[in-house]
Design a protein with these regions (language model features):
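Core AdoMet radical
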Residues: 9-16, 44-52
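C-terminal helical cap(s) of enzyme catalytic domains, especially alpha/beta-barrels
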Residues: 172-186
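Alpha/beta enzyme core
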Residues: 18-44, 56-64, 68-69, 77-138, ...
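Short glycine/serine/threonine-rich phosphate/pyrophosphate-binding segments
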Residues: 145-151, 172-173
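Short acidic/histidine-rich active-site segments
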Residues: 162-167
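Short gly/pro/ser/thr-enriched loop/turn and capping motifs at secondary-structure boundaries
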Residues: 39-42, 168-173
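N-terminal active-site wall of soluble small-molecule enzyme domains
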Residues: 1-23, 126
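Short pre-catalytic strand/loop immediately N-terminal to key active-site residues, enriched for Gly-Thr
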Residues: 136-140, 172-175
């Protein structure tokens, strides 16, 4: 019933599993953001799956719901509460894996809000060079008050889709101390 109230809005469902996608599609939402952490330890803590299990489930989702517009949201691109800051090549290589599966939209998530503008620029530049046909989005948490400048750095690199939340809501249960997303109103 809610979807009919907002016919000119693009709603999407953020989900880490097949059941979430199934529920979204059954509710009339076909814009899906499927979450996989670049950090395997965070992926196991957050959604209780290995990388291989998450990728296999992504393939099952793609096969079962061809009408779904899937964006893979890569969590912990800029840092992980368990593994620290990854070398830039690690998220680039993971993005290549989902791109090779047929995904053409990837969201780069600063899950715990520790990125800085230099890291954002370097990561996006590397992603754009490695996957020139891919649409990239950005998802920044504002833990250290860097959300706006990191978002600006992403926009300056050519990112045109920014995920944000009203009032900076959000967070991650497996990222103690991490705040919500950059506030839309900012």
């Amino acid at each position: 019933a809610c979807i009919e109230k907002y016919p000119n809005r693009k709603l999407y469902a953020l989900t880490p599993n097949f059941r979430g996608v199934e529920n979204a599609v059954n509710a009339g939402i076909t814009n899906i953001s499927y979450v996989i952490s670049v950090s395997e330890s965070h992926n196991k803590a957050n959604i209780r799956r290995t990388h291989e299990e998450s990728l296999a489930e992504l393939q099952k989702i793609m096969d079962t719901f061809p009408q779904a517009d899937i964006c893979v949201s890569l969590a912990t691109v800029f840092g992980c509460p368990f593994e620290g800051i990854p070398p830039i090549q690690k998220p680039v290589d993971f993005a290549k894996r989902v791109y090779d599966m047929g995904i053409r939209s990837i969201c780069l998530a600063d899950t715990i809000g520790i990125a800085d503008p230099k890291q954002v620029r370097e990561t996006i530049t590397a992603m754009l060079a490695a996957l020139p046909g891919c649409e990239f989005q950005i998802h920044i948490h504002d833990t250290r008050g860097m959300g706006l400048v990191n978002t600006l750095a992403a926009i300056e690199c050519g990112i045109t889709t920014v995920q944000s939340t009203l009032g900076g809501l959000g967070g991650c249960p497996f990222a103690p101390g991490a705040s919500g997303n950059t506030a839309t109103e900012d």
